[in-house]
């Protein structure tokens, strides 16, 4: 048996003015054929899980196309057209396959296609026909659509946020594919779409209220005939009609068991919905709280979420830390121009910089400050442990670490980087 592997992943923030272009995929992952195997086979990613699951079952994996970009604005129409044309050219070139393992994100948006994932999955189904299995994974933040459900035999969502189980879900999808091809199971997929969206502040799966919801799902997963249950939290930064939380269940045969567990799980979600309201505080309150806290403290600007597509050059927290003279404070800001100026000045030299706030005023205006250059780095680092997003190799571009006499240290980067790994800090001293 031969099973193809396809992936197109990007989390689209529709509130960002700039679009995600083809070069953003090239800077992250844009791979074809055996390059996918050599790059992803051992990764903490569902594609790595696809390879492992098929290999364990002695089924041939046929890697076809993989594209991934860091969360940012919507994918430009030209970029999406080029990506999908290449994907289906390579799919045709791969010849007859017994099934397809797919890894969409679930919250990708592009111009006339607010449901990119559903669009390309539907096109794949049209091309391969109803008799060829299509089984895949979804990011836990997917905005599930009926089109995605109808185009596939089974979709399996991550079970953890931060996303540490991507490889496991890939293995699970591959095992389900092989069992289906061997006639051992007959997956029947059902979904419900409650009128609800989880506040992103409350989406950690190891803390209340998500913890209890996911524990309940684990119990339901043990029911006879249930192959998979997924809680898709949704991505609130994609302002599309599909935006919202959804539940998926896959049963072995259409015996009503999937509908039953979905009814129970959706009832529990709905009855606890008030617990998912955000509890954020204003910036001044956050600063004042530092006077009462000892030890390390992490301040989160929920509107400047790089992992959710923000520009990464927000300055509101940095300005507040400087104003309040918070010693030994630290921020990371994407600013290629300021980084180059700091690198040109050299380690140990002081320079006046305008830092951040260059992509728009929503997340603050530039900071004008005199800083001393403490270090200059390549910006490349590796992570050996499973981390959110399945990344293992990182490149935030040339990096400069500078310090202001207020006590603030700033890591300046030439590429946007979400805080997925502590190696980002360790690699820069």
Language-model-detected regions and their locations in the chain:
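Internal, active-site/partner-interface "lid" segment
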Residues: 181-210
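Gly-rich Lys/Arg/Thr-decorated short loops/hinges at beta-loop-alpha junctions or inter-strand turns
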Residues: 30-32, 63-72, 103-105, 265-273
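Charged, often glycine-rich, active-site loop that binds/positions anionic groups
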Residues: 65-86
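Hard-cation-handling environments
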Residues: 201-407, 411-415
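N-terminal amphipathic/basic leader segments beginning at the initiator methionine
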Residues: 1-56
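Glycine-rich phosphate/diphosphate-binding loops that line cofactor/substrate pockets in enzymes
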Residues: 55-59, 63, 89-100, 286-297
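Active-site histidine-anchored catalytic micro-motif
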Residues: 4-11, 15-16, 30, 77-84, ...
């Amino acid at each position: 048996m031969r099973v193809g592997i396809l992936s197109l992943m990007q989390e689209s923030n529709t509130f960002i003015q700039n679009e995600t272009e083809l070069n953003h995929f090239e800077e992250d992952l844009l791979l074809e054929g055996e390059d996918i195997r050599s790059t992803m086979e051992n990764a903490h990613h569902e594609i790595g899980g696809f390879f492992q699951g098929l290999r364990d079952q002695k089924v041939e994996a046929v890697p076809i196309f993989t594209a991934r970009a860091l969360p940012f604005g919507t994918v430009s129409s030209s970029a999406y057209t080029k990506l999908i044309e290449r994907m289906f050219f390579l799919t045709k070139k791969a010849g007859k396959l017994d099934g397809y393992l797919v890894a969409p994100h679930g919250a990708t948006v592009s111009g006339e296609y607010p449901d990119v994932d559903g669009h390309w999955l539907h096109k794949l189904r049209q091309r391969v026909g109803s008799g060829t299995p299509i089984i895949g994974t979804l990011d836990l933040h997917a905005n599930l659509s009926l089109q995605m459900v109808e185009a596939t035999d089974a979709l399996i969502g991550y079970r953890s946020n931060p996303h540490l189980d991507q490889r496991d879900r890939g293995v699970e999808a591959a095992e389900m594919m092989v069992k289906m091809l061997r006639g051992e199971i007959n997956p029947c997929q059902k979904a419900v779409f409650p009128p609800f969206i989880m506040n992103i502040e409350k989406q950690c799966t190891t803390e209340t209220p998500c913890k209890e919801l996911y524990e309940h799902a684990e119990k339901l997963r043990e029911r006879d005939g249930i192959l998979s249950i997924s809680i898709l939290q949704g991505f609130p930064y994609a302002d599309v009609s599909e935006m919202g939380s959804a539940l998926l269940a896959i049963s072995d045969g259409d015996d009503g068991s999937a509908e039953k567990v979905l009814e129970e799980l959706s009832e529990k979600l709905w009855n606890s919905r008030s617990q998912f309201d955000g509890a954020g505080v204003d910036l001044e309150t956050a600063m004042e709280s530092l006077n009462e806290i000892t030890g390390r403290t992490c301040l989160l600007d929920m509107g400047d979420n790089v992992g959710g597509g923000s520009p990464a050059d927000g300055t509101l927290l940095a300005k507040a830390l400087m104003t309040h003279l918070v010693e030994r404070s630290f921020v990371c800001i994407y600013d290629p121009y300021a980084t180059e100026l700091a690198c040109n000045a050299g380690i140990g030299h002081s320079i006046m910089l305008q830092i951040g706030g260059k992509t728009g005023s929503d997340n603050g205006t530039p900071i004008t400050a005199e800083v001393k250059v403490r270090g200059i780095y390549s910006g490349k680092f590796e992570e050996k442990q499973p981390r959110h997003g399945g990344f293992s190799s990182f490149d935030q571009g040339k990096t400069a670490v500078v310090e202001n006499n207020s006590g603030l240290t700033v890591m300046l980067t030439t590429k946007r980087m979400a805080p997925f790994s502590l190696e980002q800090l360790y690699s820069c001293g």
